[in-house]
A protein has these predicted regions:
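Terminal end segments
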Residues: 29, 37-40, 44, 550-616, ...
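Second-shell loop/turn segments in exported
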Residues: 92-95, 143-155, 438, 448-454, ...
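Stable alpha-helical elements in mature extracytoplasmic
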Residues: 115, 139, 143, 154-157, ...
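Hydrophobic alpha-helical segments
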Residues: 420, 424, 433, 470-574, ...
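Charged, long alpha-helical assembly modules
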Residues: 639-723
Length: 841
């Protein structure tokens, strides 16, 4: 039974307050007014804002909570990071749930509603198609099937976290302290459950896996262009691109599995001409990451250093929530710090007092689209091996704010749910064909148990064994330990296909393209203590072509991985022992290796041509450029606009605007075409656009005209950061500019980097807004587990809090803060909260 008592301590007396709850409409208006009033104060008078905000930010120092066995103390440091000290794991997870909810409740609820397909319930009919899509994905159903795989002990910990969440929700309801977003949208949060926790954990799988849209892109493109053009733009990883585990590390050569796609393409001639509309879900922005680990033989401390900066959407509040969990008793011991997803217990990425770990997106192809043949006499039957099989039909009802409920059937074949009717841009796309999505995220898994085991692992063997339980999303795990071990391992379930390479949709009426299992755990790529003394992973190709299984057909452009390797090899060659500050500087590196390579090809094409004065000045700026994508420089602006114009000139007319915007592997393909054309190799794409020289010259001239429209006609006043910028955007601010300016007063902040630099910052090509980056960065020296990190824009989801965006400027200025891992670093905090067990237990 839920029990909570609130003690307001004033003059050492306990005071019970009567809570006033206004009528809903009045309360909604009051809170909207609060947003405007305090947002205005924040925008114009920061000091007054800081004083007044305390009226609406809870400052309780003590709570009495049922279910705790001992007192728990939470210390909040100067960045609002909770350091939770408890006597057992159940108590520490309950406290984690409580304090996380205090900071991120509305974000947690929105994540839950997204994955469960329940956004229309509070946001109205515009989100119906989005809800249909996620109901079809059925991630919450696979999460539900996963619960039985978890141990009783882990389920108990997870329930403790949920109890902590629900305790705070009830407390906030009683004192009318729910986040203001709930009042404005006129609803209250429901209790949190283990199913909610596991469901939103699968949002990472969704965020990191979009191969099914890539399959549709390739097939639609293959129908629009001839075979010669199509062959030129098949996925291709550069021959000089770095590989995380090259052949020389494997110590052996094995025969690679042969997979072709010719029959697949020939069997798809009946496919609909309207499939391009399915790509509305896709995005140019792809989620990546940087990670590397350095042996102690190359560090000043003599212990390994690990660096990690996962790339994900830049949003407010941050995707990540920083937390420190400390438990110390005779039977249970844990001291772990890092980040997690709000609503999920434990630490997903970080370090304890013995090991550190990080991840990057593996890019494994874990999704396939199957073209299912429906029985014309029975719409719930599909052909398989000459017979009609009954599909599972789940009748869904979507509640919609302001209108009647919407009934919606989810049809699930042997390969997965039919998704072809619901993929679109806020509209239902009806197709003759039936596409079923097979995805490793639709299988029952116990990923969170693996991560909770990692939190308490003390060495490589324990860490590796924990990964046996891990399935999705497929990640590259980087590891370092106090004993000097450094390692890399692929974690997750990667399918083994009977046939095909995952590039295109395949017929589902027989077993020709079936999955026949997953790559065995012992055969997943792994390297421990390599002779070179470091390991780098930056979404580049994972392993050489002698590996017997197909992991993926396409990888990120190799520039980030190549640059990290370059910096590490230089330090080692100079015999310079690395310290944590050196590695932080590497994370902040803005050298554009793409420009280093391509300008040697592109600039000479311009020299024989007559240019106007402004164009000539732009060429001089590029000639003098050090190829660093710094925010204050004009050269990055000229270069990136020029490169983009080359892409547009090559592909847009032939592909059409829609397909061009959804183009897969655009960077690798474009750069390879430029390199080959410069070497004299014939390119049909360049020939169709007027020839290599014409494309390069005209693209340059067009890009200069575009920049003039943006920043005037003096190139020496142009700045990359005037276009390329970071901005903290609360979801409410995206819809209403006035409210957005009040909630996010810092406005646009110039930032360096780009989509090819180690300091990654991919952006909207129309607005320059940063879309994808590394909101959380970490560097850890295993000597005394000294860690530094940053989490932009901040810890709190409350836009009235100082911690809402206090890390934004640190992030833009490429600064990290020292983690307060030792008790003496955080126990003197003035922000101390005690959670006391109820006497009525």
């Amino acid at each position: 039974m839920l029990y909570i008592q609130y003690n307001a301590q004033k003059n050492n007396k306990t005071k019970t307050s009567r809570v006033y709850k206004p009528f809903p409409k009045i309360k909604k208006a009051m809170n909207l007014g609060r947003v405007i009033f305090y947002g205005s104060i924040r925008a114009f008078n920061q000091n007054a804002y800081r004083r007044l905000r305390e009226h609406f930010i809870s400052l309780e120092k003590e709570y009495v909570i049922s279910g705790l066995s001992e007192e728990v103390i939470i210390y909040k440091d100067n960045r609002g990071i909770p350091h939770i000290e408890a006597s057992n794991l159940n108590d520490v997870y309950k406290a984690q749930g409580f304090i996380t909810t205090k900071d991120r409740l509305w974000q947690m609820d929105m994540s839950r509603r997204l994955v469960n397909g329940r956004l229309s319930e509070i946001l109205g009919p515009d989100l119906i198609n989005n809800d249909k899509l996620f109901r079809s994905f059925s991630l919450f159903r696979s999460a539900q099937k996963s619960i039985c795989l978890y141990s009783e002990e882990t389920l108990e910990w997870m329930q403790s976290y949920c109890d902590g969440v629900n305790t705070y929700i009830e407390h906030a309801k009683k004192l009318n302290r729910l986040p203001v977003e709930f009042t404005i949208l006129d609803y209250e949060p429901e209790p949190w459950s283990i199913l909610d926790m596991l469901s939103i954990g699968r949002l990472l799988s969704y965020s990191l896996s979009h191969n099914f849209t890539n399959e549709i892109f390739r097939f639609e493109l293959q129908k629009k262009i001839d075979d010669e053009l199509f062959e030129e733009i098949k996925p291709n990883y550069p021959s000089d691109g770095p590989i995380t585990i090259p052949d020389y590390m494997m110590g052996e050569n094995v025969k690679i599995q042969q997979q072709t796609s010719e029959k697949t393409i020939n069997n798809l001639d009946f496919f609909s001409d309207h499939l391009a509309e399915l790509l509305n879900l896709s995005s140019e922005v792809t989620k990546g990451s940087n990670g590397w680990v350095i042996s102690g033989k190359h560090t000043k401390s003599g212990k390994p250093i690990l660096a990690n900066d996962p790339h994900i959407e830049m949003q407010a509040p941050s995707t990540w929530y920083q937390t420190h969990l400390k438990v110390n008793n005779e039977t249970e011991n844990m001291n772990v710090i890092g980040v997690t997803l709000p609503g999920v217990c434990g630490i997903i990425l970080g370090h304890n007092d013995k090991i550190a770990w990080g991840v990057t997106n593996n890019r494994a192809d874990v999704q396939d689209l199957f073209i299912e043949k429906r029985n014309p006499s029975n719409p719930n039957q599909f052909q398989y091996k000459g017979k009609w099989e009954e599909a599972e039909v789940i009748e869904e009802v979507i509640k919609v704010k302001g209108q009647a409920d919407v009934a919606f059937p989810v049809v699930v074949t042997r390969h997965g749910p039919i998704i072809s009717d619901v993929i679109g841009n806020n509209q239902q796309i009806k197709l003759k064909e039936n596409l079923a999505l097979q995805w490793n995220a639709n299988y029952p898994t116990c990923d969170l148990e693996a991560l909770l085991d990692i939190n308490r692992s003390k060495n490589w063997e324990e860490f590796r064994n924990s990964l046996r339980k891990y399935s999705t999303p497929v990640l590259n795990f980087l590891f370092a330990s106090e004993d000097g071990t450094i390692a890399y391992r692929v974690g997750g379930k990667i399918p083994i296909r009977n046939k095909g390479n995952g590039l295109l949709p395949v017929p589902g009426c027989d077993d020709e393209f079936e999955w026949k299992g997953f790559i065995p755990f012992e055969e997943l790529p792994e390297v421990v203590n390599p002779k070179q003394g470091f390991i780098v992973s930056a979404n580049n190709k994972v392993i050489g072509d002698h590996y017997p299984y197909m992991i993926a057909s396409s990888w990120d452009a190799p520039y980030r991985a190549k640059r990290i390797n370059q910096m590490l090899r230089k330090s080692i060659a100079e015999n310079t022992p690395l310290v944590i500050e050196d590695v932080k500087i590497m994370q902040d590196d803005t050298l554009n290796l793409q420009a280093v390579q391509l300008l040697n090809i592109l600039l000479p094409v311009l020299y024989p041509v007559k240019h106007n004065k402004l164009e000539t000045e732009c060429i001089r700026i590029l000639q003098k450029w050090d190829c660093k994508d710094t925010s204050y420089n004009a050269a990055p602006l000229i270069y990136h606009f020029w490169w983009w114009e080359i892409c547009c000139t090559l592909f847009k007319e032939k592909m059409g605007t829609f397909l061009f915007e959804k183009m897969v592997d655009r960077m690798n393909i474009t750069d390879e075409l430029i390199r080959k054309a410069a070497q004299g190799n014939d390119s049909t794409w360049f020939n169709n656009a007027g020839g290599f020289e014409k494309v390069i010259i005209e693209s340059f001239k067009k890009s200069i005209i575009t920049i003039i429209d943006l920043q005037g006609n003096n190139p020496y006043e142009w700045k990359w950061g005037e276009f390329h910028h970071f901005i903290t955007k609360h979801p409410f601010g995206k819809k209403n500019k006035f409210i957005g300016n009040l909630i996010n007063p810092q406005g646009k902040i110039p930032i360096g980097g780009s989509y090819v630099t180690v300091a990654l910052a991919s952006y909207d090509r129309k607005t320059g807004h940063i879309l994808d980056g590394a909101p959380w960065r970490m560097v850890v020296d295993l000597k005394d587990c000294l860690g530094m990190d940053i989490n932009a824009p901040g810890q709190s989801g409350n836009f009235l809090s100082h911690w809402y965006d206090d890390q934004s400027l640190l992030y833009v200025n490429q600064q990290l803060e020292t983690q307060k891992f030792k008790p003496e670093q955080y126990r003197n905090s003035k922000m101390k909260v005690k959670l006391k067990p109820s006497k009525s237990m």
